[in-house]
């Protein structure tokens, strides 16, 4: 935390902005809070209707009419896997020849070119372009099924978090960076893969994922494919997630996947004098002793076995609720994406928006598996007093302009719009 942020934090506390009614509960002075945030946030004149959403809904009916009797699955793809590497699976349903499926799914607001594919039991793909249609048939001369297949992977989102919520931070959105995908292994089994890509926080940070559409009572078991937790052998008492179980019941009754209690430990399981070593991991392009390090990302895949009440194929990645947990002013505070900003998955610490929603996110969902987040100390994008700057500041394709008007610069997050020296 920079000195200016420490000074502001002191003003917030000594000025009585926050009143504490318990160690887990805070109340905010609405007018003061709104004024401070609007004066500090990198974007002034924020769109009053902004939801910080980069996704849009799609629906497609796919009919399978090919001679192969061994078709088992239909997928909707964001590219042609016989031509392009890195194609993602946006939707997947069991299906056989002579039948159809009608999946709904999410795509980025910068809409990709869609393809539909039928896959047989040997993994052979029969692909057709969707061409903007709402109803497409896999069959006839349009089918592509020859050449080298680049195996598609499941749709992956990047989640970016600021550690200082509810206080203003530097808004480089790299304090914790996670990349998450999910898919159904069968009707009752959901696979959730989480990659911890970077930690730019200066203090201990925990994390979990709430599954708002899956009741805790509908889960039979959760296992980790790798056999160990993110923070296996963590030698210090757990602070944010006291339950040693892999999953637990959320405050609203939903299932919560407990990821880790200390992000730094997950990236580098090292202690000195009984304290976890805290450095910047993968947020600077150089290494500095005791300050920053470049390390491999860490991944875990969670297998969620569910009762018949839930069909895994109908669970949307866009609706999960990853969040981090931090300690601010003695409170255990959760940092959620804007959709779930005032939800409390594990801890109770606020009275909700209480009419003081300032339209400001402390976490972002980016619909890109390889999103290049800002390097340490560089804001995602700034637009104040007519000046545009930051990691994503290309004119008419900038984060700041999108913040002012949700209908413009919707492609700001594409790598082509980044200031390359300012992103990781």
Where are these regions (language model features)?
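Bacterial Sec-dependent N-terminal signal peptides
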Residues: 18-46
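Structural beta-strand segments of beta-rich domains
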Residues: 56-58, 188-192
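Short Pro-Gly-centered beta-turn/loop motif in secreted/extracellular proteins
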Residues: 94-115, 120, 128-132, 137-144
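Solvent-exposed beta-hairpin/edge-strand motifs
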Residues: 209-244
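A eukaryote-biased signal for long
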Residues: 252-424
């Amino acid at each position: 935390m920079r000195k200016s942020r420490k000074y502001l934090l002191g003003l917030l506390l000594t000025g009585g902005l926050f009143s504490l009614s318990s160690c887990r509960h805070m109340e905010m002075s609405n007018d003061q809070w709104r004024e401070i945030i609007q004066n500090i946030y990198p974007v002034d004149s924020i769109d009053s209707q902004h939801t910080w959403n980069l996704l849009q809904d799609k629906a497609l009916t796919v009919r399978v009419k090919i001679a192969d009797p061994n078709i088992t699955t239909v997928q909707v793809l964001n590219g042609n896997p016989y031509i392009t590497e890195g194609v993602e699976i946006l939707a997947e349903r069991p299906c056989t020849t002579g039948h159809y499926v009608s999946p709904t799914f999410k795509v980025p607001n910068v809409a990709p070119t869609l393809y539909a594919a039928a896959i047989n039991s040997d993994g052979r793909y029969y692909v057709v372009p969707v061409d903007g249609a709402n109803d497409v048939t896999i069959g006839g001369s349009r089918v592509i099924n020859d050449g080298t297949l680049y195996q598609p992977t499941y749709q992956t989102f990047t989640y970016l978090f600021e550690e200082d919520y509810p206080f203003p931070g530097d808004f480089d959105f790299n304090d914790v960076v996670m990349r998450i995908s999910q898919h159904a292994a069968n009707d009752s089994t959901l696979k959730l893969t989480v990659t911890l890509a970077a930690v730019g926080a200066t203090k201990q940070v925990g994390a979990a994922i709430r599954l708002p559409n899956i009741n805790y009572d509908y889960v039979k078991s959760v296992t980790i494919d790798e056999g160990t937790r993110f923070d296996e052998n963590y030698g210090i008492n757990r602070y944010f997630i006291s339950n040693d179980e892999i999953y637990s019941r959320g405050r609203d009754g939903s299932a919560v996947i407990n990821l880790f209690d200390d992000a730094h430990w997950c990236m580098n399981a090292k202690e000195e004098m009984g304290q976890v070593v805290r450095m910047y991991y993968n947020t600077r392009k150089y290494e500095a002793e005791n300050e920053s390090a470049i390390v491999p990302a860490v991944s875990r895949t969670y297998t969620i076995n569910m009762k018949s009440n839930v069909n895994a194929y109908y669970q949307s990645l866009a609706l999960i609720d990853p969040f981090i947990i931090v300690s601010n002013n003695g409170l255990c505070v959760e940092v959620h994406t804007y959709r779930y900003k005032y939800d409390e998955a594990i801890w109770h610490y606020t009275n909700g928006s209480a009419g003081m929603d300032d339209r400001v996110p402390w976490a972002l969902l980016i619909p890109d598996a390889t999103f290049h987040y800002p390097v340490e100390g560089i804001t995602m994008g700034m637009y104040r007093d007519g000046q545009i700057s930051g990691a994503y500041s290309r004119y008419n394709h900038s984060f700041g302009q999108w913040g002012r008007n949700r209908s413009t610069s919707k492609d700001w997050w594409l790598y082509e719009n980044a200031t390359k020296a300012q992103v990781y």
